[in-house]
Amino acid sequence: MLRAGGGDRKESLNMKTKAVRIHGKMDLRLEEIELPQVGPDDVQVKIISDSICMSTYKAAVEGAEHKRVPDDVAEHPTIVGHEFCGVIQEVGENWKNKYKPGQGFAIQPAHFYKGSQMAPGYSYQYCGGDAQYGNVPIETLLMDCLLPYNSDVYFYGSLSEPMSCIIGTFHAMYHTKAGSYEHQMGIVEGGKMALLASVGPMGLGAIDYALHCDRRPSLLVVTDIDDERLARAESIYTVEHAKELGIELHYVNTAKPGCDTKYLRELTGGTGYDDVICFAPVRPVVEQAGDILGYDGCLNFFAGPTNKEFKAEFNWYNVHYLYTHVVGTSGGNTNDMREAIDMMTSGKINPAAMITHIGGLNAVVDTTLNLPNIRGGKKLIYTQIELPLTAIADFEKLGETDPLFAKLAEITRRHNGLWSAEAEKYLLANK
């Protein structure tokens, strides 16, 4: 039985914070709570940003039935949000050799302490991203999952968690060698890769990583069924830029006549793909992913379904004779997160393309509960301010009457329509 973390604390409560907590199925509430005093094994943090993940929506849908949400969440509600970044506020005596007040941090929520599924953002009463302050659980500290973050660009720190999931997916791909039982991990360098349903926020991150990581394909095909989203992806990650990197990049709307499975295979010269990642839990997409695999092709089912009975057909002849295989990943590890932080802070990747909306802590409940119905990519929350959920695309119009958005519109124009460090600094200084 999974019980809420932090409930055994006996110290007096002394710091008040606003936080969004889950009480049950589709029951999220913005509340003011008190945090326990910082003890010798505690680290208290000030949270600046949190990006809302579809996994939080899934947790809201399932409530206590979710594998990370405690069974007693109705009696001991927990704070949601697990893609967060900020500044260390206070450090307990036993951790002063490792952490310092004023130091930036990012957090790897999946600590897996002693095999536990507990994680900040799901399982703890006093730690989650959709709060102003929080006390980091001892399990996170023991597993080295509170990571130093040496940057003042907080949204990058928030995006290091979703980017680590993408990086972990690439690392989890595997291939075989005739006569050997050892798997060769990672995508095929110089191989043929397809990213299906891949112009949502996670798909955009995958395009960025595929183009700029240390092991790249020679052919990259990105599919979706939405022309507008495909066009946005192509304007950010251009065919010309990919060509400069030695990669042949194609964007394909598979809903259009002639852009079917046969066409996708033709783009490979008929061999099929070495690596395919599926970003939608939709049966036709999953089956297409299997059908375009080549010899020893690896399919990663990245998209997590909420339906526990979700099934799709797979060509088992090809499994036997062509060594096709499937892997599923749902998150990265701490090293993946370190890689994400390093690549972002060094300028190798820019996951700002994932963000299409910004908002304050007051926007979290409605945004999370309606997440599947809100078009666009990542919804980025700044937890220390109040701001309605606002699309970056609406800055220009809002700026006609609001000087804040007029300036943000000017800044985003200079950054190819993307959220940026400059925009973040201006927002936090003026809101």
List each model region and its residues.
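C-terminal hydrophobic helical "lid"/dimerization subdomain
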Residues: K177, P257-R265, T271, P284-D291, ...
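Hydrophobic/small residue at the entry helix of a nucleotide-binding pocket
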Residues: P201-M202
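Adenosine-nucleotide cofactor-binding segment
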Residues: G190-G191, L196, I207, L211-V285
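Rossmann-fold NAD(P)-binding glycine/threonine-rich loop
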Residues: E287, A303-Y323
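ADP-ribose/adenylate-binding Rossmann-like module
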Residues: D275-A280, D291-F310
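Glycine-rich beta-strand-centered segment in the early N-terminal region that forms part
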Residues: P36-S51, E65-K114, G128
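Residues in the short beta-alpha loop(s) of Rossmann-like NAD(P)-binding domains
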Residues: I225-D226, P305, I385
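NAD(P)H dinucleotide-binding glycine-rich loop of Rossmann-like/cofactor-binding domains
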Residues: D71, P109-K192
